[in-house]
Amino acid sequence: MAHDEDDRRNLELFQALLIGIEWEYEVARLEFIDEIQDLMGRWRGPRPNFHQLFPRAEVIEWLLSDALNTMREKYQPGLRFIKFVLNSGYRDRPRFENGEYVVARTTPIHRAAIMRERHAVSWDMAIEALFEIYDRYDLNYVDAETGLTHFHVACMSNCVYAARQFIHNGLSPDYYPDERIDPPLHLALKYHEFNFERTPMIKMLLRRGANPNLATAEGTRPLHVICRKFYDGAELAQQFFKLNDELRQSVDCNVADVWGRTPLQWAVASLSPELIDLLVYRGADWDGFVFPDQSLILEAYERQHRLRYRFGFKLKLAMRARLVDEYLYDHDYELTASDATKIMELLARHRVFNVLSELEEQVLTDLELVENARNVQIKQGLTLYDALRLRPKELERRLEPRRLYAFWKHKNLYQLNTFGEMWLCEKLLCEKMMRGFMRSWGLASFMELNRYVWPFEAAEVFVDNLMNENLWSLCKAVHWREEPADEESDSEEQQQPDAEQPRRGSFDFRD
């Protein structure tokens, strides 16, 4: 009885809040969503009947859209409101005009997809709830401005049930009516996050006939999408190949887009040694490999930019750069100075370079950090403290990039006490482990810049006194050529290494 009385009071209060609101004004609607937050939290019985309380269906649609604007706020009041509407039993009623249903209609689902933040699982939860409200899977609503449809939103938001229902109602798993929107499989792969599970969506689409080699208008295949990814590209590619093997479908590893860019070039541009290895194992043409051009490197930077402030990203980027360099070297592809400068540019834009002497002073004078670092083992006979105090040349002799990369992947830096300690150690390890690569190319560039008139020993002394950031600036001054942003690379010579460029040769730090 007490609960019934509470429910009655809640309903009366809810109805009272509706009085006098001018629904045409967004400010008024947002105030309403804010005012009913406490009420929604204590509501235990049947929810109010939104169909009865809101005779104008567009008001509910406005409120659901406005709720999305509060998704970034603390406690996500928008998500709470959407679920409250869903639990009330409210379902959208399609519009019927001139004897047919209207599908050219922008819904809150479209708006949620456009506003959606990557790595934000709450957005997927909101979209999933909205699909239960807009539950007519025989009507694939399309946003006229963007070309985005409900089916595409389901694929990019991991709403497997909704996507399956659209296919069941006759949509092709390769539905691609508009060049402005990628095909379903491309979207599922693009929005596959390294810390959220997207494999069921990819599996569902492939098993229902999605083409693993489908090209967009720009020639982008699903494998291109995978190879653009920084964090989970190798793992996702492994799953993708495995699923297609089970379905007895082949995946073309050598296909290029309209700009001539192959999956292997994207893997190199993304500095993913595991992915490069997998592609070569799967048949990627290594003999015809051309190092990615500057535009591809910079596009990779733009895709990684949002990860720059994530702890461990810079060390991972630096180690992957070293591993890609070694992988290319071991497969008889020798970097040119221009190639190396492109890698340096990517590292510099992510602010990987620091002042070594300042970092060493900060780290080695912190007694608590030193004590903690002594207890962190990188490998047998080498502690984190050893790595932090050794000179770069000695550290490279005792610690292979692959071993440090494995150390990072197992999150062993988290054994330190504070994030401050971890950030300092990450920066110092980056600076030291990149030193050999930077020095060898800096020396080659310095000799070229001075037309080889300096004695080699004198040049070595000069270069040894430069920081990694200075060496990058030196290489960039000699070898970096800005490319027009809109210019398409339509000739082979634009991608071919310059035959006159110096190669590492006698400057190789491996010698």
State where each predicted segment sits.
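Start-of-repeat signature of ankyrin repeats
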Residues: 105, 146-147, 180-181, 219-220, ...
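Amphipathic alpha-helical repeat scaffolds of TPR domains
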Residues: 61, 102-111, 148, 217-220, ...
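Ankyrin repeat boundary signal
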Residues: 100, 141-143, 173-177, 212-215, ...
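Cullin-RING E3 adaptor/co-adaptor recruitment helices
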Residues: 1-95, 100-101, 115-116, 266, ...
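Hydrophobic, small-residue-rich alpha-helical packing segments that form membrane-like cores
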Residues: 155-157, 163, 169-179, 187-196, ...
